[in-house]
Each structure stands twice: as C-alpha cells, then as structure tokens.
C-alpha cells in the first residue's frame, strides 16, 4: 500500500550538450489535493510561515505550495468570470422575454380596443337606423301614459258604468210596476228580482267609490246622483 505522502520529485539531471534538464510537472496525490483545497477554502493567500507548515505536513516544498495557490486563484477567477457571463446572458434572455411579452400584451390590447370600437360603431348605426320606428311607437306609449296619469277619467268612466247599471235597475223596476195584471205570486217574484237588482246596483256603485281615490268634486257628483251610496261611503270613512 502506497503512502499518501509519497510524491514524485524530478531531480536536476544534466541534459544533452551539458544543458540542465527541465523539471517535470509536479503531480499531487489525492490526500495532498484535498488538504490544499481545504486550506484554500479558508485562505486564498498564505503567509510564509503557513506555507512552511503546510509544506512540512504534506511533504512538499514551499515553492510547490506557492505555485499551487497561484494556479488555484487563477482558476477561481476564470470560474467567477464564467459565472458572470452566464448570469449576464440569462439577464439578456430574460429582458428579451419580457420585451416580447410586453409587445404581445400591447398588440392584444390594441386588438381588443379595435374590436370594441367596431362594436360601438355597429351599435350606434343600429340605434340611428331604429330611431324612426321608436319615434312612431312613442305616440301610443305617451297616450297610454297620459291616460294612466289621469285617474279622474277612469273614475268618471266607472261612475258612469255604476249609474248606468243603477238606471237599468230603476227602469226594470218601473216596467215591472206597470204589470199590475199579474197574480200575487208573480208580483212577489218580480219584487224580489227588483230588490236584488237595486242591491246589486247599490253595491256596484259603492265598491266603485271605495276602490278609487275620489276628490271632493267627484264625491259631490256621486252624492247628487246617488245620495245613499255617498252616505254609506261617509259612514265608512268615519269608521
């Protein structure tokens, strides 16, 4: 088993023509490399005293320790430069992607605005073309609204209807009274029919008055034509 502190050292042997032979490249064992990396992790530069201690511990010369640290610092600078270039390239790519994204968003917004403007133009043209028909139909709606906003007209119509039914009841009663030649049973049936007609007419007018909101003038008109219904309405208002 080989000793981890073994090292290869090339001696200075005389070359051809008496020239000194060039020293070969120093090879480090795994243990030596790990110890040097550990020391470089904490200190990138070593003092002369620390170089002597490490050289004695790893069975290396002080010059070998110095050269190894110089090479390691150069390697670290190259690594940092490569990382910086990679980060710069990533930043440029990210900026390009953001720019493309912003351009796509702007184009989509412009397309949406153009579509919205076209829709508004179409709706405006349709409204302008349909304005004549809407104006023609406005007369019927206005007449209906005016009729609805004048409840007195409706009240007068209902009043005429109630009085008309009352007149029908009275007329029927007068015609029935002229039929004196009938027998008593027939006269009783006729009187019952007459009373029912009068009551129905009375309730019709009374309900009409209660259903509507009468003014003082309309109430006076009802009192003149039908005093019984007016008195009944007055009693209900007092209650």
Curated annotation (Swiss-Prot):
GO BP annotations of the record are: anterior/posterior pattern specification; negative regulation of transcription by RNA polymerase II; regulation of DNA-templated transcription
Task: Give the Pfam families listed for this entry.
Answer: Abdominal-A (PF12407), Homeodomain (PF00046)
Q: Does the keyword Coiled coil apply?
A: no
Can you name one GO molecular function term for this protein? DNA-binding transcription factor activity
Matching InterPro entries: Abdominal-A, Antp_homeobox, HD, HD_metazoa, Homeobox_CS, Homeodomain-like_sf
DNA-binding region (UniProt annotation): 21-80
- Keywords recorded for this protein, A-Z: Developmental protein, DNA-binding, Homeobox, Nucleus
Residue spans making up a coiled coil are none
Annotated Basic and acidic residues bias: 90-104
Where does this polypeptide localize? Nucleus
**Function, as annotated:** Sequence-specific transcription factor which is part of a developmental regulatory system that provides cells with specific positional identities on the anterior-posterior axis.
Q: Which family does it belong to?
A: Belongs to the Antp homeobox family.
The protein, known as: Homeobox protein abdominal-A homolog
Kindly list the organism's lineage. Answer: Eukaryota, Metazoa, Ecdysozoa, Arthropoda, Hexapoda
Q: Which gene encodes it?
A: abd-A
């Amino acid at each position: 088993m080989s000793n981890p502190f073994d090292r290869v050292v090339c001696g200075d042997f005389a070359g051809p023509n008496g020239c000194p032979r060039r020293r070969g490249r120093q090879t480090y064992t795994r243990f030596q490399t790990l110890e040097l990396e550990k020391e470089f992790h904490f200190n990138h530069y070593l003092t002369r005293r620390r170089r002597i201690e490490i050289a004695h511990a790893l069975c290396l010369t002080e010059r070998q320790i110095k050269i190894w640290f110089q090479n390691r610092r150069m390697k670290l600078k190259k690594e940092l430069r490569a990382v910086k270039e990679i980060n710069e390239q990533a930043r440029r790519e990210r900026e390009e992607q953001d720019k493309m994204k912003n351009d796509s968003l702007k184009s989509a917004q412009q397309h949406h605005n153009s579509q919205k403007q076209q829709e508004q133009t179409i709706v405006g043209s349709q409204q302008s073309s349909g304005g004549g028909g809407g104006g023609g139909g406005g007369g019927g709606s206005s007449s209906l609204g005016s009729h609805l906003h004048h409840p007195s007209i409706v009240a007068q119509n209902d009043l005429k209807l109630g009085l008309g039914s009352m007149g029908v009841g009275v007329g029927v009663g007068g015609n029935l009274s002229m039929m004196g030649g009938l027998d008593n049973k027939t006269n009783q049936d006729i009187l019952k029919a007459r009373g029912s007609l009068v009551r129905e007419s009375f309730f019709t007018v009374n309900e009409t008055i209660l259903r509507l909101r009468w003014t003082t003038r309309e109430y006076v008109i009802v009192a003149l034509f039908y005093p019984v219904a007016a008195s009944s309405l007055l009693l209900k208002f007092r209650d």
